[in-house]
């Protein structure tokens, strides 16, 4: 190892140890289409093995935001990687694409092999749960860019869908139903506000809240919707989908709608998670604003024909996914979303 490089703040040996630690986690995610192994200059994936007639590649990249601060402050590094995967694969899933592979980027003040292993374990868990290969990544040690103990992670996912099956919302029509899939909690958005509420409330994160600790509640990994949605695609014609992330209902559901149509949502048709009630009370936040920030208990929405509602609910529930009929599509040139019972 270069002594000069070490004196500048880069520990190459720690990097080597981190790679050794993560190898077994990465290997459990690999699919048969992956060519080669770790250590190459570029990762390779054989699309021909998918047996698609006209594959369309769909890509997405994202991070975890300031949820990371909670994970770092409380030394809980083994699930934040699931969030990084979920934020990417849930996004590309909205086109009907099956996620194929994932790459990660970790930047840190100092490479601590045990911490890197925990982060990559979480990433690998998310990849394994969605049959997505973790085929590459980068860990950068940048002591001058981050404070001690800090790190940031970002992910990049690629999926594929048959061109004729690509979902873009163009087949959405008046009268179709909106199905909401339950979230696992806050997911990965709104954490600057969450952390502000934690600080102002003075709550101790190891205290109990609704059957678990506050910390477990706030760090609950983002739900992965890949398997239930890919299964549902085999049974019905999905018209459009939305991943409820930053901007809540107001920002994300209209993204799936053609001009002239609007989503009418009955907010009494699904339960609001207790964590959102707590946040709203602590921050004295209006219900309208809450729906403009958080998922409020619905992390993903799909639009289907009315005749397919029961099949949709039955299929999703058989995949251990809680789902509700939460609204319908109406004509409206001016307002892209109507939330009933919201002030």
From Swiss-Prot:
One of its GO terms (biological process) is adenine biosynthetic process. InterPro entries: PurM-like_C_dom, PurM-like_C_sf, PurM-like_N, PurM-like_N_sf, PurM_cligase. It comes from the Bacteria. GO terms for cellular component: cytosol. Its main location: cytoplasm. It catalyses: 2-formamido-N(1)-(5-O-phospho-beta-D-ribosyl)acetamidine + ATP = 5-amino-1-(5-phospho-beta-D-ribosyl)imidazole + ADP + phosphate + H(+). Keywords: ATP-binding, Cytoplasm, Ligase, Nucleotide-binding, Purine biosynthesis. It is found in: Cytoplasm. Pathway: Purine metabolism; IMP biosynthesis via de novo pathway; 5-amino-1-(5-phospho-D-ribosyl)imidazole from N(2)-formyl-N(1)-(5-phospho-D-ribosyl)glycinamide: step 2/2. GO terms for molecular function: ATP binding; phosphoribosylamine-glycine ligase activity; phosphoribosylformylglycinamidine cyclo-ligase activity. It holds the Pfam family AIRS_C. Its EC number is 6.3.3.1. HAMAP family: AIRS (MF_00741). NCBIfam families: purM (TIGR00878). Belongs to the AIR synthase family. This is Phosphoribosylformylglycinamidine cyclo-ligase. The gene is purM.
